[in-house]
Amino acid sequence: MMDDLKKQASIAALEAIKDGMIVGLGTGSTATHFIRELGVRVQAGLRVHGIPTSEESRKLAVEVGIPLTTLREHLIIDVTVDGADEVSDGLDLIKGLGGALVREKVVAHASKKVIIVVDETKLTGRLGIKAPIPVEVVPFALEVARGQLILWGGEAKLREKEGKPFLSDNGNYILDWWHGPIDQPWALEKQIKGVTGIVDSGIFANVASQVIAATSAGIRKLQRAE
């Protein structure tokens, strides 16, 4: 059921993709649906180039036949389609539970439009309700960064995979910081990034142009207020 909702929302996002566009390709389960559906359109004749936000997305895009390009060749992306782990009423986001938060943020900020595709369980009203804030950290600075996050409140756990520290595509560690409800996402995002050794966080404030949410009652399209 949930997987079907994600697929429906991904198909709805394809309406924004036009011939000749440069498209940012997100990471995660919902983005996977979008990449596969975009691949079907490409095979049918749609001409686009994709910029993936992770090695995982790059491999899938190649598999389904989407031509790829880079930010070096195209500094401006027409539209990026990605998922999110939480979406607030103001369309701020927590992302990065898939581990690609830094590249996702780079691509998002290079995009004219960012469409976030989710199922209804991700609409949480406020951020920090269900998900931790992923924080990407240079390995040398791990304990300093963890200590600072704990001082601010909550618990910060090193993400692991198969008994070893999880490594991002950039070769960094990720701390999952259970902060609790977030009142000012933009301020906290800036505060976290100000810690030496922290690369960035999974708070995406003022980034999403539109959120497409698949619900049991149908597709909801939410626009950021101007």
Locate the predicted segments by residue.
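Conserved phosphate- and dinucleotide-binding cores of soluble alpha/beta proteins
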Residues: 4-7, 55-226
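N-terminal glycine-/serine-/threonine-rich phosphate-binding loop
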Residues: 1-79, 92
